[in-house]
Amino acid sequence: MRRSGSKESTIVYSALSLAQAGRGPEALALLEPLKSTPINSLELLDIIQAVYDDQKKGEESFVFWEKFLQTYGKQEKNLLAYFKASIRIKSLSHQRKAAVELQKNFPSRKHTLWVISSLYLLSKKSENEVEQRLLKALAEKTAKLIFEKPTGYIDSCEEFHLYLDVLLLVGDKDRALDALIHQDADRFVDADADLLLRKLELLASCARWDSLFTFSLSLFQTGNTDWKVCKALLDSASNDDSKLVPLKDCILKALSTSSTKRNLHLLWIEASARFFPEEHESALLGYIKKLYMKPIVFEDLRPYLLKLNVDAQHRLLDAFKLADLGESNESQKVDKLYAEVLLLKIHFLLFESFTAESVVDYVRRCFVAFEKGLSLSKGLLPTDFTHGYEALLLAVHSLIYMWEGNKDLKPAEKQALIFDAICLLEKGITYSQHNFHLKLPLIRLYLLLDGGFPAAAKVYDTMSIKQIQNDTLDHYLLTRATTYYPSSVTSHYINSSLKIYGSNEFETPEMISMAYEDGAYSQIEDMRNFRSRLDHSTWKSISLVERARIHYLTAFKPPKQYLPKCSSPKDNRDLKVFADYGSDKLPTVEESLRNSPKPDTLWIHLTVIGHSLVQDSIVNGDFEKAVLSAKEMEVLCENNDLSKQLTSEEIVHMKLLIQLGLLSVKVKNGDYENSSFETIENLIESFDYENSTPLSQLTKYTEIINDLITCLNSFLYHVSATKKKEFTRQYQLLKNISSNKLGSISGITKHKKKAARKYVSELLSNSWLSNLSETQVPYDPKFAKQVGEGMIDSYIQTTDAVSKLPKFVKF
């Protein structure tokens, strides 16, 4: 910059460098003088826009665009770049403006459709009623000109979708339906399944039950058994009793000719549940007898089975007999095995309690079924799931519910039950190496054991998680990852998890632009919603917090860019991917296997404010801001049940940060009271740990002490001269207490490392499965010891990571 003076490119690239280093305000200040002069390069405009967008000020960047267009003319190339820039920044107002300019200067049908789409999206987003009415009127008027006769026409299915969107936007459902049922629309409806489904939805929404039944019945009779078609039949019959007999006749006729179609059975089961209760049990039994070999059958039947009374449940089980099934060839043997597993699932669903006595016989039956499955799976590909693997999963679920619900078990016995479940799943994976149904609970089980994170991560690495799944599945491993394994390895996992959000920022706008170019209007709103869900993802915020924590705990002060900036988080975490066989009275297995409360918006807000209170406010001597942050945290703590999202150690951490924030200004002004320090002293003294304290708690205690010492160091620097001597005494007292606590943590981690083998040997010696007499467990003691060796390595790696933390506390 010194060499080139005010050269635009140098200033712009310098601003980009500052923004990437987390110095966003300085980057914006550097770009400010350029607002008065037109930028002569589209590339530089894109960089300027990216810098402003990084600071959540993307709208301001259009000052540069307007100057550019005024100076260099509204050529089509420039206006197209302006349109795409608007998409990148999610500015619908500028997108509409760019589309209007394109249509005005370069008239075409495509540009007019861009105007309609932009008006539609903008009116849906607008919160101003007057503006909303105006935008709707403009969208409707433009759509009428281009789509309706005599001036217009519809040229494709995508244009039809856009036309319907506008009509539904203005609340004209009847007009939209009339357009769909007109004979001119038939070729589009026949060619586009989504248009057909929209027609079904509009017929139901407009309460045209006769037309809905006739149309859906015609589809059904020609072989279309899509569930939305089936639902349309059910809805029309629900609103018109005269349709019940024809509905029953058409279903039974279809079942008589195609008895293995899943949706036909589900339609009959639902219809019998609603309209023909005397035939409901028969419908359920018919589905079981025809499709028992399909694993999905249990998931389909589960809600209906739970509604049956006990007598009906037992009648159903008695009516389906394994002895009636043939097994003269390999295929029949496999089918019979799936029937056996289905019955095991239903019995699991009907369990009232999971005591050791009630579980023993059931687990034995599961093991027998699993062994049968292995003998029948020898010809499968390595990527296939072994036959009957769910029998093993059912045994594991039994152990999990017994572990959770049996209060008489000693802690060592409960830990051993977890290890039993781990060994079962590890054995299952040796036969079914790509089975995520086994791997996800295995990850959670490892995390329930002290020092289990590296072992869990090793399993997670084998799952080949796609980038798109990072937002939905990474939470199974990485929730509170810093607490459970504070190392550079964790930082690597978190950075990998965050890559999808960078891809979303750059790739999704390009996909939206391509959709406009290709005229794929039905996809644009879905793409925008997808982009928004990732932009405001709850997991994104949690991951950014964890990245800040891991940098902070391992001697690196994180720049501000590491802190979450998204508001109104959208929770995309997949909590239902776990197989679930239990009744509604039980918590799901996913809930049972959580090693800590599920963090959500409250956790994010408290953690971000607390981190900022220490690193941004107190460290920099901005104590007035620290007080405001502390009061904000105080309100959040008072108005919420913290235990639903925070661990007990995190609650203590928040209380300490509130105390430090409120104390900061008083220390600076010299009007604090010694009782304030006594409160903090008592809080730190309450940290009670021993050799059996989990490593995760030691990590959190170290983090709390680190925050305390960081704040005390700043207080010592900023305290008023008149109180310096007195404060130094308080500082020294708290420092000594903290040093002793850190010394104890170091001593405990050393002891834990030495006792790693003893810890795992206790898991093996207390095994519940190995003590079951006359039970053939699917793994031998040698295999359990191999799993134990892996757990020892995991435990030692974790103790090494935790033992390093006290060294990074800066006194």
UniProtKB/Swiss-Prot annotation:
Keyword Glycosyltransferase: no
GO biological process, one term: protein maturation
Annotated keywords: Cytoplasm
Gene Ontology cellular component annotations, sorted alphabetically: cytoplasm; cytosol; NatB complex
Keyword Cytoplasm assigned: yes
Source species, domain of life: Eukaryota
Listed Pfam families: NatB_MDM20
Predominant subcellular localization, coarse grouping: cytoplasm
Subcellular location: Cytoplasm
Molecular function in Gene Ontology: acetyltransferase activator activity; actin binding
InterPro entries: NAA25_NatB_aux_su
Quaternary structure (record): Component of the N-terminal acetyltransferase B (NatB) complex.
Family under the similarity heading: Belongs to the MDM20/NAA25 family.
Purpose of the protein: Non-catalytic subunit of the NatB N-terminal acetyltransferase, which catalyzes acetylation of the amino-terminal methionine residues of all proteins beginning with Met-Asp or Met-Glu and of some proteins beginning with Met-Asn or Met-Met.
Protein's name according to its UniProt entry: N-terminal acetyltransferase B complex subunit arm1
Organism phylogeny: Eukaryota, Fungi, Dikarya, Ascomycota, Taphrinomycotina
